[in-house]
UniProtKB/Swiss-Prot annotation:
Reactions catalysed, as given in the entry: L-histidyl-[translation elongation factor 2] + S-adenosyl-L-methionine = 2-[(3S)-amino-3-carboxypropyl]-L-histidyl-[translation elongation factor 2] + S-methyl-5'-thioadenosine + H(+)
GO cellular component, one term: 2-(3-amino-3-carboxypropyl)histidine synthase complex
Annotated protein name in UniProt: 2-(3-amino-3-carboxypropyl)histidine synthase subunit 1
Phylogenetic classification of the source organism: Eukaryota, Metazoa, Chordata, Craniata, Vertebrata
Cellular localization per UniProt: Nucleus; Cytoplasm
Encoding gene (name): DPH1
Top EC class of this enzyme: transferase
NCBIfam families: diphth2_R
Pfam short name (any one): Diphthamide_syn
Function text: Catalyzes the first step of diphthamide biosynthesis, a post-translational modification of histidine which occurs in elongation factor 2. DPH1 and DPH2 transfer a 3-amino-3-carboxypropyl (ACP) group from S-adenosyl-L-methionine (SAM) to a histidine residue, the reaction is assisted by a reduction system comprising DPH3 and a NADH-dependent reductase.
Organism name: Cricetulus griseus (Chinese hamster)
E.C. numbers: 2.5.1.108
Pathway linked to the protein: Protein modification; peptidyl-diphthamide biosynthesis
Length: 438
């Protein structure tokens, strides 16, 4: 499913609006002209892409044509880059646009790089593989962003059989995943509800069941196990950190293996508390604003600056797209670093740095704004978060009405982030309305 960041007016009598359900796939498809949907040459060209990956080529072509875009940029995680040249060929063949691939690393939805795209003269950015996490200004009308989630179809029957062989009937299970597999996750949850107490938790503004490496929900005490659908451990570790007492399992849809997973919570927490303790004696602080796409939050940076100024602590600012120990070692006068980029960089790799490398939350603990939390909070993008050291803290979570900014989705360029969740009113919000948390 894709989400276009551009305001769209609802059809007369439509049920679009807060709490009114979603636009059906059929209606969305009907908005694409039949000469695109039924074009035999386009259908043949799309066969060059894997059939179980939904790159939404017809919709992308239609949106490019609607926007009358002349220069289009494609941004995608490295796992999808092998399909980039094929997509470029298709889009250039069936539109009048010049299409380029942005090759800088894309770790997640926080890395959507509209700044670089617009600096290159791009008027339409297609971001693949992530949901609409970062809100952008809607006032500039010469730039559009289309999010293509790249829904991946897998062998759902094997997933269901694996769960049934592993867990006794009546068990209380929580199911989570990344955006690519959320549709499959919901289908699996519906199938399993006859035999298990199944929940699909939600950490707003994410979709039900969706987790990020830095943002995961706290699970109710009655949950006996959490099952993550996806490859790798990065996202899974997020929900494990947030729920240290819940046994975690991972179903890899590629290897078709359901495995029990473990995490050394004691070691992680001891390492992070040691870094915080060292920071409390620091004389000079360094504040890093991540510049990889929209990874850095100016709002959090401003909060940290305000706190350090109030305490009379000197600090330096550093802008970095990627943070390496060798780079920070060039500034030996800094005693402690706080990176406003990716919390997992500190959690996973902080011990590799010569000086303490704190997350904004850990900086708040070091400055005694908050006590150490148990469990460790994974709420960096959560709407309901602990404090101003998180991205969406204090923002109005209420839904926007029709015709108000960010209905549809143009996320555009101002350096701050808009005062409401990213997904209100766009087709990503339609997805969330269709996938109720349970």
């Amino acid at each position: 499913m894709a989400a276009l960041v551009v305001s769209e007016t609802a059809e007369p009598g439509s049920r679009v609006g807060p709490g009114r359900g979603r636009i059906s796939r059929g209606r969305l498809a009907n908005q694409i002209p039949p000469e695109i949907l039924n074009n035999p040459q386009l259908q043949a060209a799309v066969q060059a892409l894997p059939s179980n990956y939904n790159f939404e080529i017809p919709k992308t072509i239609w949106r490019i044509q609607q926007a009358q875009a002349k220069k289009v940029a494609l941004q995608m995680p490295e796992g999808l880059l092998l399909f980039a040249c094929t997509i470029v060929d298709i889009l250039e063949r069936f539109t009048k646009a010049e299409v380029m691939v942005m090759g800088d690393v894309t770790y997640g939805a926080c890395c959507v790089d509209d700044f670089t795209a617009r600096a290159l003269g791009v008027d339409f950015l297609v971001h693949y593989g992530h949901s609409c996490l970062v809100p952008m200004d809607t006032s500039v009308q010469d730039f559009r962003v289309l999010y293509v989630f790249v829904d991946i179809r897998i062998d759902t029957a094997h997933l269901l059989d694996s769960v049934r062989l592993t867990f006794a009937p009546g068990s209380s299970l929580a199911l989570v995943s990344t955006i690519q597999f959320v549709s499959t996750l919901q289908a699996a949850a519906q199938e399993l509800k006859a035999e298990y107490h199944v929940s699909v938790p939600q950490c707003k503004p994410l979709s039900p069941g969706e987790i990020l490496g830095c943002t995961s929900p706290r699970l109710p005490k009655e949950v006996e196990a959490v099952v993550y659908l996806g490859d790798g451990r990065f996202h899974l570790e997020s929900v494990m950190i947030a729920n240290p007492n819940v046994p975690a399992y991972r179903y890899d849809p590629y290897s078709k293996v359901l495995s029990r997973e473990h995490y050394d919570h004691q070691r992680m927490q001891a390492t992070r508390q040691e870094a915080i303790a060292a920071a409390r004696s620091a004389k000079t602080w360094g504040l890093i604003l991540g510049t990889l796409g929209r990874q850095g939050s100016p709002k959090i940076l401003e909060h940290l600056e305000s706190r350090l100024k109030g305490l009379g602590l000197p600090f330096v600012r550093l802008l970095l797209s990627e943070i390496f120990p060798s780079k920070l070692s060039l500034l030996p006068m800094v005693d402690v670093w706080v990176q406003v980029a990716c919390p997992r960089l500190s959690i996973d790799w902080g011990s590799a740095f010569p000086k303490p490398l704190l997350t904004p939350y850990e900086a708040a603990v070091a400055l005694k704004d908050i006590s150490w939390q148990q469990p460790y909070p994974m709420d960096f993008y959560a709407g309901n978060s602990l404090g101003p050291w998180t991205v969406n803290h204090g923002r109005d979570p209420g839904p926007r009405g029709l015709g108000q900014p960010a209905s549809g989705k143009v996320q555009q360029g101002f350096r701050g982030q808009s005062p409401a969740p990213a997904c209100e009113g766009c087709s990503c919000a339609d997805l969330k309305a269709a996938l109720p948390a349970s």
